[in-house]
Each structure stands twice: as structure tokens, then as C-alpha cells.
Amino acid sequence: MDADKIVFKVNNQVVSLKPEIIVDQYEYKYPAIKDLKKPCITLGKAPDLNKAYKSVLSCMSAAKLDPDDVCSYLAAAMQFFEGTCPEDWTSYGIVIARKGDKITPGSLVEIKRTDVEGNWALTGGMELTRDPTVPEHASLVGLLLSLYRLSKISGQSTGNYKTNIADRIEQIFETAPFVKIVEHHTLMTTHKMCANWSTIPNFRFLAGTYDMFFSRIEHLYSAIRVGTVVTAYEDCSGLVSFTGFIKQINLTAREAILYFFHKNFEEEIRRMFEPGQETAVPHSYFIHFRSLGLSGKSPYSSNAVGHVFNLIHFVGCYMGQVRSLNATVIAACAPHEMSVLGGYLGEEFFGKGTFERRFFRDEKELQEYEAAELTKTDVALADDGTVNSDDEDYFSGETRSPEAVYTRIIMNGGRLKRSHIRRYVSVSSNHQARPNSFAEFLNKTYSSDS
């Protein structure tokens, strides 16, 4: 008997077959650099920076930017942002810089140039006869890179959210050490003409390079990061959510994973903690691997680890966290089962803490406290008194153990308790639910049961 096959009859003929479903066609690619070569792109011929500045600024004012020219200018302008490396900087075996070295964003990557000239059109508008200053270059670089952040804001965002952000970014780049170089609302108007620029590989690469540089190097123009910060841990929402979850419930990653009672977690946990990746290394290429083109399909995205992502946000919903209530459910990753486990884990970690005295007036008081705690433990071990089983949770030191939670779930037949459902309905019904969000899912699934 083949365990994978089913047997049935069609027109009195016995049929035996193995039902198969579509599997994920994509290969997840890990970002580790194996060849000791810095991330690389190829651009057109390096421009005259003064000419390039005037061209790009005039095109921006006319909302007619050429992405190739913009990328060529951004790469050439890196020379204006020299800084000192505070420590030896290595990643995946590549020496980026040594302590005390003078470096620019260009030191982090390799930019190859061809002999192809850019367009460098002048479209009129703000004619500049003199050569631009460094603050003017910095302002233009900041505004151009902000197009990346604006194009990453999803269409679901409500009201004037994007316009407000664009206006705030403009204010940053017209305040010292930057200078005002465009009229009000230019950034938003330009963005509408460049709404998909976050998908242009070279533009994305340069945004990630600038961000990686300014996140480590103290610099007068570090505020340029306002437009590039979204490249850090891009397409890593699964891993980022897991990290936040760990901090929230005050456990180590190892301790937390012991509570993940579902077979579908196995593959995702293996995927998320693949050896050889610099997930925990500060200032690694890992942080910007998506924008630097080191992986075509992230193994750390919410879709790649959907069961983990769903569980974490159901626990977050139970705890009343707005971020979790607003997050988008990964519909293909057992949301009903994850909501059950999320209810039990939410109950386990919500409103409970492990508290103990840690600070004392002097050493004598510390020693007295430790001695008293030892005596208390000895008394507890000697006491064989029983308690009412309903009160077991309050007396047992093991209430927060994975075994205790697992037993509770099994005893309840793998279903949520009434108290869990009431809590889920309470937090989700008081929230303006976005389409496909966890709040909407909980409302639709459990409101009739409460």
C-alpha cells in the first residue's frame, strides 16, 4: 500500500493515483557572498557633475526624470560624502575599510562604467548659471533618493499619508546643512512620474548603498537616510517580526521556538536560520541584501515564512498591538490554526511577567536576599501539599513551560477557549480593520462565536 495514493472508482473501474498540488516554483536565494567580491552594477559614462546637477534638477522641476541619468549622477555624487570609518569594517570576508580610512558610499560597492553618454537634457525651468555647491548637491541627492521611499509606500495607505511624508522630506532638504533647491510639492509631483522606481535595480542598488554608508558613518548629511531607510531589512518582514516577537515576550529565540507546535514551522525555521548568513552581524551586507541584488527572492519575507508570520501577529493581536492588527494575513499559511495557537500563546505571555529583585542598597542586603531565596526554594521542595487543580496555574512554576501550554491545547481538543475568543473579538472590533488584515480576519472568524 502506497501511503501517498488514494483509491476510488470511476465507471466501475478502480483508479489509484497520487494527488499532487502546485509547489512553490521559486528558489529562495540566500544572500551570502561566496566569491569575496563587492556587490556590483554597471552604469553609463561618468558625467561632469556640474552639468549633471543642472540637468537632473531641471528635469526634476519639470517632472521628466531619466532613471539612467539619475543613477549615473547619484553614483558620481558619492565623492561629496567622504567620512571616516570608525572600526575595521568587514562583511562575508570582504574588507570594506579599515579603522580610520577615509571612505565614501562608493567604497562599499563596485560601480563599473561604460562609454555610453547620458542624455543630460536641460528642460528649462530653474536655470543655474553658476556651479552648484556641495549643500546643493547633497539636497538633490537626498530628494532623488527619497523617490525610493515614496515608491515603497503601498496604495493601501490612507488619506494624505504619502503627501504628508513627501512634504516633511522636502522640509528636511531645505533646512541647514541642506539648502532649498526646488519649489514646494515638487517631490510629490515628481514621484507620480516615477511611482515604480523602487523596482529599477540600479536605483534600488544605489539607495541601498547610500543607506548602508550613512547608517554606519557619522556625517553632516546623514539625514539623506530619510529616503533610503526602507532598504534596510527589505523583504525581511518575517525575520523582523520574529525578532520583535522575541523582545516582546522576553524569551530567547531558542526558548520561543519551543512553543511553535505545528509541523509547518519546521521548514520555515530551517529556512530562516540557514547557517552562514550574517543575520546578527551589525553593518553587514546582509541588512541591504535585497537592494544590493544579492538575492532575487528573499527567504526571510512574510510569504517565505508565512506560518511563523501569522502566529506572531495573532499573538500580537491578542496583546492588542496595532501593528499586528494592521498587518496582512498570509492566507495560504493556515491562519485558522495559527489563530488558535496564537490565542494560547497570547494568554500565556499577556499580563504575566517574571519579576524578581535585582538591585540592592549594599552587598549585605544582596547576600541576605539570596540566602532568603534559597531557604524559600528548600521549603517549596519539601512541601508536598496539593492545590485545587483549577488553581494549578497560579501555583505551578511550570505554567510558562512549552509542555504546560501544549498539554492545555490538547486537553481543549485543539480549539480556542471562550476567553480567547472574547479577547480576540474585543481587540479586533475596537479597531478600524483594513482589508485582509488580522483585525478583519479575527472579526469575521470569531465575532459570531463570542
Swiss-Prot record:
Which one Pfam family would you cite for this protein? Rhabdo_ncap
Additional facts recorded: Displays a superantigen activity in human and mouse, activating mostly V-beta-8 subtypes of T-cell receptor.
**Described function:** Encapsidates the genome in a ratio of one protein N per nine ribonucleotides, protecting it from nucleases. If expressed without protein P it binds non-specifically RNA and therefore can bind it's own mRNA. Interaction with protein P abolishes any non-specific RNA binding, and prevents phosphorylation. The soluble N-P complex encapsidates specifically the genomic RNA, with protein N protecting the genome like a pearl necklace. The encapsidated genomic RNA is termed the nucleocapsid (NC) and serves as template for viral transcription and replication.
Q: Name one GO molecular function term.
A: RNA binding
| InterPro entries (UniProt xref) | Rhabdo_ncapsid, Rhabdovirus_ncapsid_C, Rhabdovirus_ncapsid_N, Rhabdovirus_nucleoprotein-like
| Name assigned to this protein | Nucleoprotein
Q: Which family does it belong to?
A: Belongs to the lyssavirus nucleocapsid protein family.
Record has Ribonucleoprotein as a keyword: yes
Q: What is the lineage of its organism?
A: Viruses, Riboviria, Orthornavirae, Negarnaviricota, Haploviricotina
Q: Which keywords describe this protein according to UniProt?
A: Capsid protein, Helical capsid protein, Host cytoplasm, Phosphoprotein, Ribonucleoprotein, RNA-binding, Superantigen, Viral nucleoprotein, Virion
Q: How is it modified after translation?
A: Phosphorylated by host CK2. Unphosphorylated protein N seems to have a better affinity for leader viral promoter encapsidation. Phosphorylation of protein N in ribonucleocapsid may stabilize the interaction with protein P, thereby playing an important role in viral transcription/replication.
> What interactions and quaternary structure are annotated?
Homomultimerizes to form the nucleocapsid. Binds to viral genomic RNA. In nucleocapsid, binds protein P and thereby positions the polymerase on the template. Protein P acts as a chaperone on free protein N to prevent it from aggregation before encapsidating genomic RNA.
Sites of Phosphoserine modification: 389
Q: Where in the cell is it found?
A: Virion; Host cytoplasm
Taken from the UniProt entry, a GO cellular component term is: helical viral capsid
Superkingdom of the source species: Viruses
